[in-house]
Design a protein with these regions (language model features):
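Exposed, interaction-prone regions of secreted/extracellular proteins
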Residues: 1-241
Length: 241
């Protein structure tokens, strides 16, 4: 975590590290059980599912400067979607160009032992799906370390819907502690589609940490990722890739 000076009043803005990279802490929001995220008409809202009441309007998933970065990318030759943050240590992905949406993407993990050394590292291990424009990722995440939503020297899980770094929103389910040796399955399921909008559920089977996201763009890039900050060991690995 760190601070950057904001223009104007000379205040400081706290920057936190999410599974989608760094961003202002004020852009990280909890979506509790019984609520869902709606992206209808390009605006993200927190909705009480039973009553369909709008609880909060967040605005676009990405702020202006992030959308500008996307525009710059679109001016280059078209390439495959890539990591939403440069903190991905290793990853592998698959682009869906079948003409049919991905309706299920699941990964089973056996939670590993604690890291051999403790150097305040923050680890995120996840399967995820991005849209075609680099702008958002939906992801069931296993974490080690202290993240902006909690944690410490133990493993825990949460589901995230995250925009691009620096200015994008990061919406998440509650964080749930888990134990080394446990088998967990992170799943993203297509729950509906209508008029070019798609709805998904990101979840861990058997855990109360679901994150429903409705009426967003299609997610076409499926990826498995290890993301890390704060560890010199992982920086060395990346230098030798």
């Amino acid at each position: 975590m760190g601070k950057v000076n904001t223009s104007g009043a000379g205040a400081a803005q706290r920057i936190v590290i999410t599974p989608g990279g760094p961003r202002p802490a004020e852009n990280v929001h909890l979506i509790e059980p019984g609520y869902h995220v709606s992206g209808k008409n390009g605006v993200l809202r927190k909705i009480h599912t039973a009553s369909d009441q709008v609880i909060r309007e967040f605005g676009p998933v990405n702020a202006d400067k992030t959308r500008s970065r996307k525009t710059l990318r679109s001016q280059r030759q078209a390439v495959a979607p890539g990591p939403i943050t440069d903190q991905w240590i290793v990853y592998g992905g698959w682009i869906n160009n079948s003409g049919n949406p991905i309706n299920y993407f699941g990964t089973q993990w056996q939670i590993p032992p604690p890291p051999a050394s403790m150097d305040n590292q923050l680890l995120y291990l996840f399967n995820g799906m991005e849209d075609a424009g680099y702008t958002v990722i939906l992801q069931p995440v296993l974490q080690w370390g202290a993240s902006p939503i909690g944690g410490g020297n133990y493993w825990a899980i949460a589901n995230w819907y995250v925009g691009s770094p620096d200015s994008g929103l990061a919406l998440h389910s509650p964080l749930v502690p888990v134990n080394p040796g446990d088998l967990i399955t992170g799943v993203m399921t297509l729950t509906g589609q209508s008029n070019g909008a798609f709805s998904y559920l990101s979840s861990f089977a058997g855990y109360n940490a679901d994150l429903p996201v409705k009426d967003i763009g299609e997610l076409i890039w499926a990826v498995q990722t290890l993301e890390c900050t704060g560890s010199s060991n992982f920086r060395i690995i990346r230098q030798h890739q």
